[in-house]
């Protein structure tokens, strides 16, 4: 009878361990990947056509509170197609920065690094649909809509400071 009780107890402990392990696997790591296609609306003198392209943003779980704002560290990588008087060039974007979010609705993010051939910044600000997507619809994604802008000390390799801006729509996936 004792061996039957011990076997039952071991089976119960094993089942509980499996349940705990299963719960751990479903827990999010706090990172997100976001892809933001951008349609250019304004351009600097370096461009005859407004650049179009996309930026990939990797948001980390690392950050802190700044009063009512949530700050998180992120990195951005992107590629855009530009043109000046028939000559095509493709500025890339690589930067490290952060995101500020107010009430899971209004956001602003900035990244400093390389834009084209020079140092530069990327900014993206607007509204987040996080509350609707995650709380209302229980989806692991977020949609952000806003203005996106780029400024560089040397976009095309010609040594001139320029930039562009446009409308960005980003889809973030949390994992």
What are these regions (language model features)?
Residues 1-66, 164-175:
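Short glycine/proline- and aromatic-enriched beta-strand/turn motifs that initiate or cap beta-hairpins
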Residues 29, 95-101, 140-141:
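Short hydrophobic/aromatic-rich motifs at helix boundaries and adjacent loops
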Residues 31-43, 69-81, 105-118, 128, ...:
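Transmembrane beta-strand segments that form the barrel wall of outer-membrane beta-barrel proteins
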Residues 42-52, 65, 81-90, 111-124, ...:
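Solvent-exposed loop/turn segments connecting transmembrane beta-strands
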Residues 57-61, 97-101, 124-128, 170-172:
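Outer-membrane beta-barrel architecture
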Residues 61-69, 103-107, 130-138, 174:
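Outer-membrane beta-barrel channels and translocator barrels
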Residues 71-100:
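Mid-chain, structured segments of secreted extracytoplasmic proteins
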Residues 133-175:
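Ligand-binding grooves and catalytic loops that recognize ribose/phosphate and carbohydrate rings
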